[in-house]
Structures are given as C-alpha cells and as structure tokens.
C-alpha cells in the first residue's frame, strides 16, 4: 500500500502519477483537515481522490496497516509519530534546504532574509520536527523580486521533480540517507509568525521594509498593509531620509513616499484588477510603469489570471516579451491548468494569425503541458485547427 498524506498541487500530482503507474487500488490518501474537496488556488487532494476512485483514509487507520510500501507526507498538516506505524518507510518532502528552516513558514523566512537560493528536501521522518536523515534535495534560485507566493510556487514545481526522481527508489528501498548536520540548522515554530497582524513595521531600513512587503505577499491569503491599504511594491530611492522612519514625505494617486532609517521609499498600493483589465489596450510604456501596482510579474487574480495569461489571450506580443524579460513564466497556468499557449491559441484562431503562437513555442512554451482535466492543447483542436497550426502541434 502507498499512502499520500497532504495537500495542494504537489499531493495531487503525486497521486496522479502513482495511479497512472500502479493503479488506484494500491494507494490511499489522507487529505489535510481543511481540505473541503474543492479546487481553489491549489488543487484539492480530496476531490482528486474521489474523481480517481481512490480510498480516503484517516491517519489512525493508516497507522494500523501492516503492508505499507511507502508513506509520503506532502504538505501534511499533522505531526507524524513514526513509532505508531507498522513500517519505517515514512518520508516527507520539506519545503526548505534542510537542515535550515525546519518547522513553519518556509516561504516567509527565506524572503525576509533575502536568500538567493532555496531547496526542497526529501527526508526520512523521525521523532523530531524535520530532523530525519536526508535522501535527496533539489536546489533552485530565489530572485530578489520573488514574493513568498513566488517561492511557494517554486517549491511546488521543484518538489514534483524531486518526487519523480526518487519515487522508484523509495518504493524499492534502494536509496541511501545521510544525517543532517548542525551547522545552519534553524527551526521556526508556529508561534514565530502571526499572519493575523500584517501591518508593516516602519522603524526599519528601506531594504528591510521591502523584504517585509515581499515576505507577507501571498495574495490567496493576505497582502501586507501600510496605512491600512494592501501594499504590493517598494521602490527604494536614492534620497537619504531626513525625517523619522514612517513619516509620509509625499502622496500620489496610488503611492506614497515614506522615510525609513536610511533611504526614502515609494510605496505602491494594489491595483491588480484594474491593471489586468487595461492590458488589452495599454501602451507598452504605461504597462512597464504600472507593473509597480501589482505584486510581481506572476501576480494573479482569483481566477488565476496573470499578466502573461491576459496578454496572451489578447495577442499582446510586445507585453509578453516584456514580461518574459522580467521573469514571467512562459508556461504559466490559471487555476484550471489552462496554459499561456492555450490562451494564445484562442487569439490566433480568432485572428487567423499564428505568429504569436509560433513566438511562444520558439521561446519554450510546452505544447504537451496538461491542464487539470488531463488534456493538452491538441485535445482542444479540430482537424481544421490542427491544420492551421501546422507542424507546430
């Protein structure tokens, strides 16, 4: 028996892979307590298990199973007590570069600390909190422009790759594990952060203020507040602060200028919905300037529409090029898994012009990327439409 315990896209992905490779009768899932069976900004493990006909179990039920081949925790919300299991093949993919950032809020601390690298780590589960022997990890870069939600999305994508890399050896038992060291081993408990109070501390340097805004920026749950307004961007100016930290030096239509310990900053407030609605006709120069009014190039609304998705649907190749130069994902997907290329396909068919489509493919757009119904772009095309796109499909 294989057990998947957890939540979100990584747990759903693991379940889909296992069912595809081994069948649905060999696996059971333990969804997190707050999994209501509905997809939102992340997919529901409970919903996917029901769709696939996979058994849903409780932790207590699983602890009694004797023939567990693999127990894998993927963002699971309960403490695993390995001594309660009938097996020692209990593993976790932790969202940090262990031994660093044990515990909670692993999307927050690397951002506020200004880290340039992060990782996802596969480890054995022991009686400690994220202290088990390390089997493997996958490292990746963290941009200075990344918010906490951007880091979380990178965790998800890299954990999928780590899962693919180690699934077979976890099942066979043909792997080695190394004890964690004590150097750079830090632990953050639940009480280390209070997301119910996201008013920013202004008695700090300009750099610290910017890191706070980026670290608290996780739109599905909250945006940081300054003067009670959702805040998305901090621009550090070259003007040394002459007034006390937190003093408002100037006010604009959608920003304020504030003093800090060292340099004045421009603070921009959230305008995402207006920004997205204006992309179809917005001049490129205005677009570049208005990027300060959203939480980064991969920001998205409640439908999962990001700037590059909206630009693709409306055929704004100039905007797409600018977004890609700033780090936007060419394979971005909305909350149904609809990709940038799928949106571009609609524009090209409406205008009978495939130049945008060809541009995206040449830049690395994946024509075989699956949406969350398990369909790729070709599945949505008629024979005439396939002929229109030619050999690209």
Where are these regions (language model features)?
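One-carbon transfer enzymes
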Residues: 1-220, 253-267, 271-273
């Amino acid at each position: 028996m294989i057990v998947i315990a957890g939540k979100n896209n990584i747990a759903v992905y693991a379940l889909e892979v296992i069912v595809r490779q081994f069948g649905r009768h060999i696996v059971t899932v333990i969804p997190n307590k707050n999994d209501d069976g509905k997809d939102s900004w992340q997919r529901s493990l409970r919903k996917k298990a029901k769709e696939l006909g996979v058994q849903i179990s409780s932790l207590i039920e699983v602890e009694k199973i004797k023939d567990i081949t693999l127990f894998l925790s993927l963002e699971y919300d309960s403490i695993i007590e390995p001594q309660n299991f009938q097996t020692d093949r209990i593993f976790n993919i932790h969202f940090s570069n262990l031994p660093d950032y044990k515990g909670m809020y692993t999307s927050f601390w690397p951002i506020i600390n200004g880290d340039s690298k992060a990782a996802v780590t596969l480890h054995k589960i022991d009686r400690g909190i994220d202290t088990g022997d390390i089997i493997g990890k996958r490292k990746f870069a963290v941009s200075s422009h990344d918010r906490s939600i951007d880091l979380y999305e990178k965790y998800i994508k890299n954990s999928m790759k780590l899962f693919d890399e180690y699934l077979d050896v976890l099942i066979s038992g043909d792997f080695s594990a190394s004890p964690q060291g004590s150097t750079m081993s830090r632990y953050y408990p639940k009480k280390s952060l209070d997301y119910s109070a996201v008013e920013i501390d202004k008695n700090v340097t300009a750099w610290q203020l910017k890191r706070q805004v980026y670290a608290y920026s996780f739109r599905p749950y909250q945006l940081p507040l300054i003067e009670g307004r959702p805040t998305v961007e901090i621009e550090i100016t070259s003007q040394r602060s002459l007034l006390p930290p937190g003093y408002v030096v100037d006010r604009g239509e959608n920003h304020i200028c504030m003093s800090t310990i060292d340099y004045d900053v421009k603070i921009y407030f959230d305008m995402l919905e207006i920004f997205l609605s204006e992309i179809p006709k917005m001049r490129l120069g205005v677009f570049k300037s208005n990027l300060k009014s959203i939480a980064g190039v991969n920001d998205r609304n409640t439908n999962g529409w990001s700037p590059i998705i909206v630009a693709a649907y409306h055929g704004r190749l100039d905007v797409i090029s600018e977004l890609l130069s700033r780090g936007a994902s060419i394979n971005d997907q909305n909350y149904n898994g609809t990709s940038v290329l799928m949106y571009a396909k609609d524009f090209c068919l409406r205008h009978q012009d495939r130049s945008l489509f060809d541009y995206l493919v040449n830049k690395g757009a994946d024509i075989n990327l699956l949406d969350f119904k398990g369909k790729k772009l070709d599945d949505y095309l008629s024979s005439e439409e396939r002929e229109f796109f030619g050999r690209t499909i």
